């Protein structure tokens, strides 16, 4: 798929769809619920001025951040699922920040670009293998 032909909204929708596919690999109910909350917020990325920050908080939070969960995970399938979910939320977070006019982004979000879709798709492939 040629990502460059998609609009920003279509890219966000694709990222969310890939994140939802990856979320199916989690079996902990609390984690599944938190991921679902993040993906539901992502679906409203352009409806709230602080959506970028709220989405980023799901990624980088000392108590319940997705990156912390990923670092503590030992199951390779779930690590790859986290890769996809984190990438999806990061991409949508960046679009939400940009939509709201924020000029200075958190460093991990600043480097996000369309190449992240290759990483998400590869992570999903690794989940299935």
List each model region and its residues.
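Structured binding/interaction patches within domain cores
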Residues: 2-129
């Amino acid at each position: 798929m040629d990502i460059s032909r998609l609009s920003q909204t279509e890219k966000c929708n694709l990222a969310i769809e890939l994140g939802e596919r990856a979320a199916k690999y989690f079996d902990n109910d609390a984690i599944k619920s938190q991921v679902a909350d993040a993906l539901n917020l992502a679906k409203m990325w352009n409806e709230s001025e602080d959506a970028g920050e709220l989405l980023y908080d799901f990624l980088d939070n000392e108590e319940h951040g997705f990156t912390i969960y990923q670092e503590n995970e030992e199951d390779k399938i779930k690590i790859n699922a986290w890769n996809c979910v984190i990438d999806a939320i990061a991409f949508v977070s960046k679009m939400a920040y940009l939509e709201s006019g924020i000029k200075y982004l958190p460093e991990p979000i600043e480097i996000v670009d369309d190449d992240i879709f290759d990483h998400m798709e590869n992570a999903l492939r690794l989940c299935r293998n």
